């Protein structure tokens, strides 16, 4: 990631804590208001949880300390004061694995038992790290790739089952989306080398 106001001569990782450092130095990390900021202006809350990369999670609600809501991730939580409360209640995050079964289950547990049951934000987001994490390491069509897709489908099914069991399916709209797909490639491109 190139942020000239932060580092005029080099790239940085698009991860947390680097993005926090960008926000601290430049005053912001995004050029447009977040969904959390817009909702907060109308008395509503946005909460996000995910086990993907820390940068993707951070960008969901980087201003939770100011505008409310939360971003919950294995490596950090915003607002930072929420982290210990969640650890005390739900335990430490499981180690990352392929497929990322235990972390995805941990996300779902926090989503259903805390976010949707107690905080009841107007908008909630769960970012599944699968099949993305596994497909970075294993080709499309591999057994790991299929296991990761099955894992993602299973956790989505668990969420839908929870909504039915708790009688919430009529008052919560669920949308699914993917940020990208995968295909077989013959080589990678050294982007940093090209711009460095």
Predicted regions and their residues:
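Short helix/loop capping segments that flank catalytic or ligand/cofactor-binding pockets
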Residues: 57-58, 69, 185-186, 193-194
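Generic detector of well-ordered alpha-helical segments enriched in charged/polar residues
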Residues: 83-87, 146, 192-195
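Hydrophobic alpha-helix position signal
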Residues: 39, 87, 163, 195-196
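Metal-dependent active-site segment of extracytoplasmic phospho-/sulfohydrolases and closely related
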Residues: 151-193
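His/Asp/Glu-rich, glycine-adjacent segments
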Residues: 1-139
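Active-site-proximal segments of metal-dependent phosphoesterases and phosphodiesterases across multiple
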Residues: 137-153
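Alpha-helical packing segments of well-folded alpha/beta enzyme cores
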Residues: 35, 107-111, 148, 152-159
């Amino acid at each position: 990631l190139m942020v000239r106001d932060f580092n005029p001569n080099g790239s940085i990782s698009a991860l947390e804590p680097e993005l926090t450092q960008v926000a601290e130095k430049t005053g912001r990390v995004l050029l447009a208001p977040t969904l959390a900021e817009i909702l907060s202006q109308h008395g509503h809350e946005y909460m996000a949880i995910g086990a993907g990369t820390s940068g993707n999670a951070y960008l969901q609600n980087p201003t939770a300390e100011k505008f409310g809501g939360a971003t919950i991730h294995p490596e950090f939580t915003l607002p930072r004061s929420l982290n210990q409360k969640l650890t005390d209640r739900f335990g430490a995050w499981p180690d990352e694995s392929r497929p990322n079964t235990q972390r995805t289950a941990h996300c779902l547990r926090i989503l259903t038992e805390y976010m949707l049951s107690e905080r009841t934000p107007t908008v909630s987001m769960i970012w599944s790290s699968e099949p993305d994490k596994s497909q970075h390491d294993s080709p499309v069509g591999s057994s790991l790739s299929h296991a990761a897709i099955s894992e993602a489908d299973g956790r989505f099914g668990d969420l839908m089952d929870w909504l039915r069991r708790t009688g919430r399916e009529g008052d919560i709209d669920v949308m699914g989306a993917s940020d990208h797909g995968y295909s077989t490639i013959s080589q990678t491109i050294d982007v940093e080398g090209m711009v460095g």
